[in-house]
């Protein structure tokens, strides 16, 4: 086994993202005026006392209704990569790749973006602070590295098959420059709610969202699980059997695949690993 009997590769790319980033635009300053809302209600025939009582409840709705949201596609992402490929003395093919993006756009938590438009009314509803009439960009650029290695081995005449192919892969994704979760949070599906907020605001927001529904889970996801972490890793495995000329010249390749995201949450959109996620799949190619 000659360690230099190996193919090496290096590459560089500058590309534009095809994955959409969710961003927001704050309502105009006039939408935040409680006095203006009361005046508008009175002008439409609502008694002053009633209008003043309704204003605190209606004002967040007015602000949300005058805000806007959009998707954007960040440009000029730099990608540097190194790779190798060799064959071990056992006949096992071994390959690996290291990629580095010094300015990768990472999606901020979309729930924080949504509620940031309300922070001029209540600064505790989001860890992101919004400004009336200004954009709330949905991403920040971070250093993202991806390291993966793959082993492939062939076995002939196994289980009645001409060949059995086993493939195993391990991947690791470190992210540099992440802020503490009290300053900025990345990733996590919005269906899990806002996460921890000052003054128990997470429970308050969940209670409002679930108004009229069961209230027993309002604090269940007021935690930091699910947000992008500095490290994440997992592994994949696949087995493929090759049966030639099974009938009428048809070749069949049944396969089974297994994946396990062991620890951490990768940056999005489209992160590779979500801690605890497991999947198995069966298939047949002909």
Regions found by a protein language model. Give the residues of each.
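Outer-membrane beta-barrel proteins
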Residues: 68-72, 84, 135-139, 223-229, ...
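Hard-cation-handling environments
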Residues: 85-109, 142-144, 148, 152-171, ...
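Solvent-exposed loop segments that connect transmembrane elements
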Residues: 20-70, 108-136, 179-223, 266-268
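Transmembrane beta-strands of outer-membrane beta-barrel pores
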Residues: 12-18, 100-104, 153-155, 170-176, ...
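Residues that define the transmembrane beta-barrel architecture of outer-membrane proteins
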Residues: 76-80, 143-147, 231-235, 274-280
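C-terminal structured "cap/appendage" subdomains that terminate the fold
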Residues: 261-286
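Short loop/turn motifs that connect adjacent beta-strands in outer-membrane beta-barrel proteins
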Residues: 2-7, 21, 85-91, 156-166, ...
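Residues on the lipid-exposed face of transmembrane beta-strands in outer-membrane beta-barrel proteins
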Residues: 1, 10, 82-86, 96, ...
